[in-house]
Amino acid sequence: LHRVDRRQRQMCIRDRYLYSAAQTLGITRDEMMDQLISGKAKYSSIFNYPTPTWADMGAIGWLVDGAAICNQVPLCRASYGPYGRAMVRVCKEESFHQRQGFEILLSLMQGTDEQKQMAQDAVNRWYWPSLAMFGPPDDQSPNSAQSMKWKIKRFTNDELRQRFVGMLVPQAEILGVTLPDPDLRLDDETGQYVIGEIDWDEFFEVLRGNGPCNAERLERRRTAHEEGAWVREAAAEYARKQALKTKAAA
């Protein structure tokens, strides 16, 4: 449990990095929070899937955070400095999460038949959503071309997805899990893996707010924001009083 707690704290710190980078573009944190809880702001589609067992923690770490690392390491060299510097810190944390997830799955795969099945079921749940995290195919991506032009992104969605699959296959063999893609194969001519068709209809439905947990996630965020109002108000009042003391002492 202490590892889960550490992970949650790191996620909060990561949010601060990214919100701070976004603030350099002229938007306030309050505005971004209002956009989030109103449903206007987009956020990663992967956060809208349920986690029914402990094995999901392992699959999320290995697959989801592994995909995030593959996507975010090149962003450390993004043309926009505040974003690139934030990514350097984020990637250091993601590497811990990825190793933690791999370790959880490895432990389960060395356990009972029930534990092995639990690990495999979790991999089955998270494999395809993790591949979709890189975004639509290059010929259907509305933002990739502009991001590449501005040198925010250095590789296309499909290039990053291919790299990710290339890393997953040998790791899956070590774990002893099966990647749930009957069409997955190595192309001898290109040396790259060919994957099955991703369900892009599901991906876009989740982005539209119709995923398994979209409504629940936003409602919890709204509730936390409302119940935490007194903390923000107290902090603001404390800052005001400290400013008055500093001014009086000057």
Predicted features along the sequence, with ranges:
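Inter-helical turn/loop segments and adjacent helix faces that build the functional surface
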Residues: 71-89, 103-118, 136-150
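Acidic/His metal-coordination segments adjacent to aromatic residues that form catalytic metal sites
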Residues: 35-61, 111-115, 126-152
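Extended, helix-rich structural scaffolds rather than catalytic motifs
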Residues: 117-250
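Single conserved hydrophobic/aromatic residue that forms the stacking wall/gate
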Residues: 1-13
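Short, contiguous, pocket-lining structural segments
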Residues: 57-67, 86, 93-97, 160
